Amino acid sequence: AIIKGHEVEEGYLVTGMIVPLIVPVDIPLWMLTVAVIFGVVIGKEVFGGTGMNILNPALTIRAFLFFAYPTWMSGDKVWVHGAVERDQAIAAGQNLDAISGETILGSYAQGNSVVYDYWDMFWGIIPGSVGETSKFLIIIGALFLIFTKMGSWRIIVSTLVGALVMGLIFNGVVDAGWIGESSKFYGLMSVPFWQHLIIGSILFGAVYMATDPVTASQTNKGKWIYGFLIGFLSIMIRVFNPAYPEGVFLAILLMNVFAPTIDHYVVQGNVKKRMKRLKVKTA
């Protein structure tokens, strides 16, 4: 802002509020500083600043941290609310605020059982980043964004539909016996298709990330395609990614790149339809 001689743009405030929700709470501040500088300069300013960037800045920061410091983002140093240790502590009569443990996606990926029930997953009494755990609060936020027209309901709905379709396909593969329990993919592929929406960050990504008005598709039909592919790819990456059992941020960044292409073909398709109608009327 000082270099360009104008006020600080409000778009950075949104990024500043979202980033703490998608990173571990004990990540060193110097790492976060480096990542934010990268996200702002490479993810936004290089393209011309607010309104011109093609990648979601918060996800650019998240991606930089994941690839530059993977052990802090998905390794033993990740601080989460635990599972087995929590139950043991409760059984011993201890009171815990939080401990280090494995996320639900990590447990499923390893073929382990999960001690949380569906209501724990819905209310947010589960391991995970701050923003992704409580599905109830995410839904409240989604209703607010839709009511104020700040977020597209088409993108939210289509993202969830895409995730459900991919989950159904994987369930069908397991039910058909094409994948056995010995497969390393069996754990996540056998998860009920609807449960994918209440574990991990698919719901958070659909509401707060995919709906970014700058980097998402602008046409109505394009929003349906854009959102569906995000959900579809998110579950696919979640199952097949051997290093990190979550694919939402990668899927959104990928579709950010293809959003202009989707809109281009949607617009061209509409132009061709109108030209045909015009020829029919003038014939």
What are these model-derived regions, one by one?
Residues 12-16, 20, 32-35, 39, ...:
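Alpha-helical transmembrane segments in multi-pass membrane proteins
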Residues 14-25, 59-72, 162-171, 201, ...:
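Small-residue-rich segments of transmembrane alpha-helices in multi-pass membrane proteins
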Residues 54, 58, 194-200, 223, ...:
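Loop-to-transmembrane alpha-helix initiation sites
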Residues 51-139:
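Long hydrophobic alpha-helical segments that form multi-pass transmembrane helix bundles
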Residues 26-35, 121, 125-135, 188-202:
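Structural signature of hydrophobic alpha-helical transmembrane segments
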Residues 167-220:
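A beta-strand-loop signature enriched in Asp, Gly, Thr, and Trp
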Residues 1-5, 40-51, 140-149, 207-216:
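C-terminal ends of transmembrane helices
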Residues 239-283:
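Cytosolic-side transmembrane-helix boundaries in multi-pass membrane proteins
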